[in-house]
Each structure stands twice: as structure tokens, then as C-alpha cells.
Amino acid sequence: MQFLPLFHKLQGRPVLVIGGGEVALRKARLLSDAGARLRVVAPEIRSELQELAGADGICLRGYASSDLQGVALVIAATDDEPLNARISAEAQAQGIPVNVVDAPALCSVIFPAIVDRSPLIVAVSSGGDAPVLARLIRAKIETWIPATYGQLANLGKRFRDRVKQLFPDVQQRRVFWEDVFQGQIAESVFAGKPEEGERLLEERLAGAAPRALGEVYLVGAGPGDPDLLTFRALRLMQQADVVLYDRLVAPAIIELCRRDAERIYVGKRRADHAVPQEQINQLLIDLARQGKRVLRLKGGDPFIFGRGGEEIEQLAAEDIPFQVVPGITAASGCAAYAGIPLTHRDHAQSVRFVTGHLKDGSSNLPWKDLVAPGQTLVFYMGLVGLYGICEQLIAHGRSAATPAALVQQGTTQNQRVFTGTLETLPQLVAQHEVHAPTLVIVGEVVTLRDKLAWFEGAQGSL
């Protein structure tokens, strides 16, 4: 190990930055965030850097050895290599930590790549050998640690002394904090409810038993590509005890769930419901009452034709804790991967999402509104009733030559896209054996696919 990771408290302490350009500015921003008192020396100094240092911290001249007097840290950020080497030698001779930007051999300290969730700080370093790799690893860590971890750390800080008094034994304290940071208290903070998290922690310290009640996570899995999951969705997927998933959730996404979680298929298709909706609702309640963390995983977005509202209505009625994580809805994801912008200044000023399968099985849609000019229509679950949809749109005034598209299994390697018109779309379904899940897009924007298509599945498109 070439460098020992340490954290340097710089609040109120003088730090010398030699250099006045972009590199010096980047270092100065970081030092300012840490509360350091900046002293910047350079013949020319950028205005933003001058603002950071203040009038008393600016010296518009070259470096002098006397500048090192009384400083806690030195940063050499000039493009003069001999000068940088001199600064390094003089600082180290006086026992002052020194960092020479992009010259690890001249450094006694180096800057790591930082994930800032203050007061929680994560530092990643390659010892100066591969800084780009360190930044890439930092980016991965950024996705694993929600921004609200800082709030959770602050909550722990406020209660630390009380917990220490209550649990003098180190092992007992460790078990207590592990439960806090991995359980309902932490989830309340992550869900944007810090007051609830603090209340639950107060209850625990007052002697209340841990809640036996679990929680339900209603999570949108997006249209199929696992890369389109949100950070929060992925985190909850990896900590749930039980997963209830729909037919439209891609297998690759299900595989990202916790390995030892129980998986329950509750998918539906037309006239074939593996588990009736009422039974799904009750199952969510029963599992949560067993103290389990229950993931309800739905394709697309749970609040757009996903019956998510119905499910959480039941949870709310039974006082079951829940949180909702939106997902990229099929219209957005599939249209983007098909190269079809849903709105465009020259073609469509609005877009409508329409279900092609209503609760009573009818197609009683506001057809007069749906044929208004300047809009794009996106039909979910419209494949079975496609002939009737096209017929009604034409009958109510939409031109039979209106461009239209079918996007099957959009955003995945199995994606297929077929373009035609309202008149020819039903024929394309039969000709190419198109099957669900397929999205129907109607409007002039479909013509842009010829220029904007950028993603093709393994089976190609027409």
C-alpha cells in the first residue's frame, strides 16, 4: 500500500494553492467545501478562484518560499514542472503535506475520488497510477449509495451518545445499529420521510419492540432493458424478502433481485390471470404482516395502466407501510428505442396514452378526441383490439394513410418494429406474427423513424 488513506480536518486552516487556472480551481472548490482558508498565489488568477479565496487570500505574483509559512497543506497546480518540483521539495523539507497535480512521484499526499454523502464520505484511490479508473469506480459507488445516506448518518450522529449509554456493550451496540441502518428506520429516511425515521428510532430507544410489520415496495421495472432501472428500484430489489412479479417484467430484471428472495409469479394476460387481482392485494397485505419486505415488481410504471393505484389503496386501508418507485413507462422507453419521438414541433404538440383493453372489455374510447390533429396516440395492450382501433380512428375522421407503428418487446434484444399506416397495420400483425407485449403508436411522428432509428433488436425490423 503506497498511500495510507486518512481524512484531514482542514476547517479554518490555511491551505496554499499555487496556480490560477482550471486545475487550481477544481482543487480549490474541494478545499473550500472542506472549510479550508484558501491562499492562492499566481501571476494570473481566474475570477471564480478569486471569489473562492476572497480578497485577503489572493497574491497576484509568482511563488516565493516564504509562502509556505504557517500553512497546513500545499497544492502545486502550475504547468511549470521545475517549479512544481521545487515547491514539493521545499514543502516536504518543512514537513508540510504537499500535492502536485498529475505528478504522484512529487506528492506526499494525493486526492482520492470522493463520494460525498456528508457526514459519510467514501474515498477511492489508485495511488495516482490510474485516476480515471478510480473515478469510474467512484461513479459505480455513487449509484449504490443514495444521497439520503447523509441524512441517515446524521440521524445516527444525533443519537450516538444515547445509544452508547443504553448499550454499554460494543456487540449490543453493533447489533442495534445494524438493525437501524438496514431496517424500517433507514427506509423511512431513504423514502424522504426523515421525521418518521427519527420517531421510529425514538420508539426503539424508549423500549418499544421492533415493528413486526413489514413494508411493500411498489416498483416500476421499466420497459425491459435492465439499464433503465432507477437507482432506488435496484436497491429495493436487492433487499426485498419476497418478490411478486408480472408477466411484463423481463427475466434479466428479475435476476437482479436478491438471490435468496422468494419469487411469486402473479402475471396476467387476456383471459388468463395466474392470480386474481383481489388475491394479489391480499397477498401483499399478508406478507407484510409477517414482517417481510415485499417487492411488487411491475413492468413499465406502476401508475400508468399498471393497477398500482388499486393495490396501494388496499395497503393504505390496512395501514401497511409502502413506497412507490416510478419506472420508465413503455410509451417513453419503446418509442425512444424505436427512434420515434412522441412529440415534435413540426408533427405533434401533444401525446395521449390510451389503454386498448378496458375494465369491462369494451372499447368505449373518446374517438372524436383521439382524431384531433397535432397529437400522437400510444395504445397500451392494443394488439388484440387493433383492427377495431384502426377502424374507429378512420371512421371518426383520421386518414387511413396516417403513419403508425408496432413496437414489440421494445428496449430489449428481441425488439421488432413494424411501420405502416392505419389501413395496413392489422395486416402487419398477421404477416409478421406480431405478439404481445406490443405497443401501438399512431401519428406523423412515426415517419421520423427512418432518420432517427438507432437501436435494432437481434431479429431486425421493417
Swiss-Prot record:
The keyword Acetylation does not apply. The active site is at D246 (proton acceptor), K268 (proton donor). S-adenosyl-L-methionine binds at P223, G299, G300, D301, I304, T329, A330, M381, G410. One of its GO terms (biological process) is siroheme biosynthetic process. Residues 214-462 are annotated as: Uroporphyrinogen-III C-methyltransferase. Its EC number is 2.1.1.107, 1.3.1.76, 4.99.1.4. Then it catalyzes the NAD-dependent ring dehydrogenation of precorrin-2 to yield sirohydrochlorin. Finally, it catalyzes the ferrochelation of sirohydrochlorin to yield siroheme. In the N-terminal section; belongs to the precorrin-2 dehydrogenase / sirohydrochlorin ferrochelatase family. This is Siroheme synthase. It comes from Ectopseudomonas mendocina (strain ymp) (Pseudomonas mendocina). The gene is cysG.
